[in-house]
Amino acid sequence: MKRIYLDNAATSFPKAPGTADVIKTFLEKDCTNISRTTGQKGMETYERITNLRSGIAELLNLSTPESVILNSGATESLNLIIKGLFNPGDHVLVSSCEHNSLMRPLVQNGISFSRIPCDRQGYILTDRIGELVRPETKAILICAAGNVSGAVQDIGTIAEIAKKNDINLFIDAAQNIVDLNIDMEAMGIASVVFSGHKDLLGPEGTGGVALRKDIAQTIRPLISGGMGSKSDTEEIPDILPDRLEAGTQNIGGLLALAHSFSYRVENRKQLHEQERRVTELLFRGLESIEGIKIVGAPLDRPRTDVISITSDKMDIADISQLFLERYGIETRVGLHCSPSSHKALGTYPTGTLRFSPGPFTTQEEIGITVDAMKEIING
């Protein structure tokens, strides 16, 4: 049975061509520890990872590539921001459609928050932000694209509101960093969190955060330890990115991310158009089936490839299992680590069945999926 993978919102598959080869070559031939080992491979590896920082900074129009921090991904980056910048009792604004990677650190660390309402399609009601701002509000933290609704938020308008109220805006772009068209300098954005294994088509356990330099210089590090620089002191050095990258990194993974990032950016138009075609095809096919209801962003508003559904004919968990057992189709069912999103969308506590095709999903695979849904629903 052919594998049909429709869970790219959880992790991308297939990865960018050649990504696995980069990791294999590093482990078998080029293994080294950057900023530690004195050797040709170490210098070459350092340069490749530096180029990755520069590429991300260029994508986001950030003039300080040294403040692009590379780590295990979006969850670690959000923990760095929340634990490094805020204190118990501080107040922030979040949307009512946030992921647990943001909400759990806020709750764990006693940070007070107000939720900006979203509509039933998952879009932030930007005209409600101003009324929630308090004198003690420190920041707005939002996910740029919903992993349940697929809704892409109006970052430009939210950035203007943040500027007007003189508060920092922090963006979680784990789902769609390349196509957001973020300009950190012009928009005054404090940070952009990104994941390597989703939109960037790289390996799991990679990602990071692009920080405005003044924040990168003052944020409390999440961890501390050896960095390969300023080893004569037991104090954390003020060098960037070193002060926020203690310990040996996932070097092979970051080299693979550098490769997949270049591929993703160089082919962004082609990949976006392919993803859009299969997403629209799947959306149209599913909405035509009696007993299936699409939840979240419509096709005529800014959206990603995420399509969530509910059904009044069958349990969505049963549908997901039948997809796998009968057709080899992989989806995700439940709350998707975002109970607040489901509360806002009216699908809590059952959740939704989520499809998320990717740039390598074929129209044939979408056709098989739609036909499979018809067979399952009609028994």
Pin down the residues of each PLM region:
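Pyridoxal 5′-phosphate
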Residues: 1-379
